[in-house]
């Protein structure tokens, strides 16, 4: 019979863990990270992908993630100017974390009604594909 490993917690408070969980736990940050795990996106792509997220809050979160070295902003000189966002190596490393949270949600939050049936998770599909982070 397989036994589940209990994580070893060396201290009840770890400043690094606290900073990480506060960062990725901010409102809309998880949704932004999950969207960016599928590749590079323009600002308008992100607003279309994440319903209910205001332009102001998206801009604020992207700036925070950029300051943390998780997201990179690329300005493409064209007419009109194009701005793309993508995850850095540091951001891509969060893929396993986002995937684990998605799996946990699909296991334990199945009774929570989806706000929009068209936006439900694909049952049986992995939340984060290991091939999208390339």
Where are the model-predicted features located?
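C-terminal regulatory/oligomerization modules of transcriptional regulators
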Residues: 1-12, 41, 67, 72, ...
């Amino acid at each position: 019979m397989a036994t589940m490993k209990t994580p070893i917690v060396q201290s009840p408070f770890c400043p690094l863990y606290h900073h990480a969980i506060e960062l990725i736990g901010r409102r809309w940050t998880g949704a932004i990270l999950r969207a960016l795990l599928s590749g590079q996106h323009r600002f308008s792509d992100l607003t279309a992908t994440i319903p209910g997220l205001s332009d102001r809050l998206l801009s604020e979160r992207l700036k925070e993630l950029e300051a943390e070295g998780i997201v990179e902003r690329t300005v493409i000189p064209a007419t009109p100017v194009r701005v793309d966002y993508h995850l850095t190596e540091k951001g891509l490393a969060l893929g396993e974390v986002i995937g684990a949270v998605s799996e946990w949600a699909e296991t334990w939050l199945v009774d929570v009604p989806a706000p929009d049936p068209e936006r439900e998770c694909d049952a049986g599909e992995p939340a984060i594909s290991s091939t999208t982070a390339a």
